[in-house]
Design a protein with these regions (language model features):
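Solvent-exposed, non-transmembrane regions of membrane-associated and secreted proteins
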Residues: 14-234
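N-terminal Sec-pathway targeting helices
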Residues: 1-14
Length: 234
């Protein structure tokens, strides 16, 4: 009897150990499936949208970006007065580029690392656990002259891969952003590692169309930020 109990305990411990080993892979697979569903729902909503409505959403985003540039507002100085000044026809940041109710404003694709993630408003934990967060106070990721969108992503979560492989990107690589029917391709021009407080220098440059991808580094330490700078080529 004692031997049977020990055998059962050994089996249970083995199964528990196997579960611990498999958890990251299984959890990541489930999270990727969720991300695919969110992107598919976004694509369907966009496809069913009238062209007039689609054009209006993009026009609002373009106007928001123009206001940012004209007023010289950056994310590190974003207070209530600045948010008020950035209203577009009474709409706040969170109400712009809403194709459907999930809060997805578009999606990011990086072919080199086989990544496809939804882009959400803001950089809350909820947003970063499910995809990429757009930093409020930076240009919305719809392209255009004198724009600089900043997108954040987590790295090394046990439940999802997200930006874990972002450090594999090199100068000359490309990534793509799709917002409604606007498809934008960016080429990596530079990579940097900075302290968190050094992000304040990321502002729009005259006549340039830029996006910076941001994640924590070194892996597992997270004391600095890895910046992948891209400039639009298509």
């Amino acid at each position: 009897m004692k031997r049977k109990i020990l055998t059962v305990l050994a089996i249970l411990l083995g199964l528990a150990g196997l579960g611990v080993l498999l958890y990251p892979s299984v959890s990541n697979w489930m999270e990727q499936a969720k991300q695919r569903r969110q992107i598919a729902a976004y694509q369907e909503a966009q496809a069913q949208m009238e062209q007039k409505r689609r054009a209006a959403l993009l026009s609002e985003a373009d106007r928001y970006n123009q206001k940012l540039a004209e007023l010289g507002i950056s994310f590190d100085m974003l207070g209530e007065a600045e948010k008020e000044a950035l209203l577009i026809d009474g709409k706040s940041y969170d109400e712009l580029l809403l194709a459907e109710d999930s809060g997805v404003m578009g999606y990011l694709e990086i072919e080199k690392i086989k990544l496809k993630l939804p882009i959400y408003h803001g950089v809350s934990e909820e947003a970063l656990e499910s995809g990429v967060g757009h930093l409020e106070g930076t240009s919305l990721p719809v392209g255009g002259e004198t724009t600089h969108a900043i997108l954040f992503g987590h790295r090394g979560l046990p439940s999802a891969k997200l930006f874990t492989d972002l450090d594999q990107l090199e100068v000359g690589d490309t990534f793509q952003i799709t917002v409604l029917d606007r498809v934008l391709v960016y080429e990596v021009t530079q990579t940097d590692v900075v302290l968190p407080e050094e992000l304040n220098g990321l502002t729009a440059e005259s006549d340039k169309d830029q996006v910076t991808l941001v994640t924590c580094t070194p892996y597992g330490v997270n004391s600095h930020r890895l910046l992948i700078h891209g400039e639009r080529v298509q």
